[in-house]
Amino acid sequence: MSELTTIARPYAKAAFDFAIEQNAVEKWANMLHFSSELIKDETMQTFLKSSLSASKLADTVISICGEQLDQYGQNLIRLMAENKRLEVLPAIYQAFQHYVEEHQKVAEVQVISAQPLNATQEQKIASAMEKRLARKVKLNCSLDSSLIAGVIIRTDDFVIDGSSRGQLSRLANELQL
């Protein structure tokens, strides 16, 4: 687990719990997404490394975000600036999204394939994973031609390696090559 994730998790959990309490999960997701995209900007990264005070940094970020932030979002920005944690906002957004998906009983599943999958193949994988995980799944598909053939399926809890590269690797280990 990265240091940023460790730092981000309590902020994300607090924001998520507050959003649930206020019935404003989508609003908070939008605020965090907008502010995290702003923080990822190269110009903003340089600005954050300047010697400005925390209140000046916070005021600038809040000013740029404008109406995208409500008073609670602004308070979060001020708190993060005071704690010198503004650069953690993208990780907070990711952790927040993870809490949302858990709350909605949605599991994120990464599917890495050697060749592009068609809609039928994606649907079969999604159905099988929904059955196995007992929750809805959100597939994130990507390509890796080094797999030769087949797929690798990853969730937070396990990995299924059905790739030719994985099979060859396991065979080589058994033969001790």
From Swiss-Prot:
GO terms for molecular function: proton-transporting ATP synthase activity, rotational mechanism. The keyword Membrane applies. The keyword Membrane applies. Pfam families: OSCP. InterPro entries: ATP_synth_OSCP/delta_N_sf, ATPase_OSCP/dsu. It is found in: Cell inner membrane. Its main location: membrane. Keywords: ATP synthesis, Cell inner membrane, Cell membrane, CF(1), Hydrogen ion transport, Ion transport, Membrane, Transport. It is a peripheral membrane protein. GO terms for cellular component: plasma membrane; proton-transporting ATP synthase complex. F(1)F(0) ATP synthase produces ATP from ADP in the presence of a proton or sodium gradient. F-type ATPases consist of two structural domains, F(1) containing the extramembraneous catalytic core and F(0) containing the membrane proton channel, linked together by a central stalk and a peripheral stalk. During catalysis, ATP synthesis in the catalytic domain of F(1) is coupled via a rotary mechanism of the central stalk subunits to proton translocation. This protein is part of the stalk that links CF(0) to CF(1). It either transmits conformational changes from CF(0) to CF(1) or is implicated in proton conduction. NCBIfam families: ATP_synt_delta (TIGR01145), PRK05758.2-2 (NF004402), PRK05758.2-5 (NF004404). Belongs to the ATPase delta chain family. F-type ATPases have 2 components, F(1) - the catalytic core - and F(0) - the membrane proton channel. F(1) has five subunits: alpha(3), beta(3), gamma(1), delta(1), epsilon(1). F(0) has three main subunits: a(1), b(2) and c(10-14). The alpha and beta chains form an alternating ring which encloses part of the gamma chain. F(1) is attached to F(0) by a central stalk formed by the gamma and epsilon chains, while a peripheral stalk is formed by the delta and b chains. HAMAP family: ATP_synth_delta_bact (MF_01416). This is ATP synthase subunit delta. It comes from Pasteurella multocida (strain Pm70).
